[in-house]
Amino acid sequence: MKFVLLFGVFLLTLFSYSSSEMLDDFDQADEDELLSLIEKEEARAKECTPRFYDCSHDRHSCCRTELFKDVCTCFYPKRGDNEVCTCQPPKHLMYMEKAADKAKKFGGKIKKWFG
């Protein structure tokens, strides 16, 4: 009985060691994959269309602001038959960004007063 118990503890120790080695390998693979995704994201971010610039070539290329992504909005000017598309913030999100900026400024003032 002691032999079975000792053998079981030995197998359990061996199994936990081998599984921890496998988990370390998986963690390293996840980190490498995450780094490659971040590099791709940085490369993609350089090609975005700034706010109020023409986005008719790619309607999904508008840049991201601090909080939200701009949307490609198309319209017809008063004197013209050609459709014009520009990257613009949606009205409700623009108001939310302004409110967030004011809240940050107010928070900075409070921190300055009490901090």
From Swiss-Prot:
Secreted is among the record's keywords: yes
Coiled coil: none
Chief site of localization: secreted
Signal peptide residues on this chain, from the entry's feature table: 1-20
Tissue specificity note: Expressed by the venom gland.
GO CC list: extracellular region
InterPro entries: Spider_toxin_CSTX_Knottin_CS
Propeptide, residue positions: 21-44
UniProt-annotated location(s): Secreted
UniProt entry keywords in alphabetical sequence: Disulfide bond, Knottin, Secreted, Signal, Toxin
Entry remark concerning the domains of this protein: The presence of a 'disulfide through disulfide knot' structurally defines this protein as a knottin.
Domain of life: Eukaryota
Name of the protein in its database record: U3-lycotoxin-Ls1s
Recorded GO MF terms: toxin activity
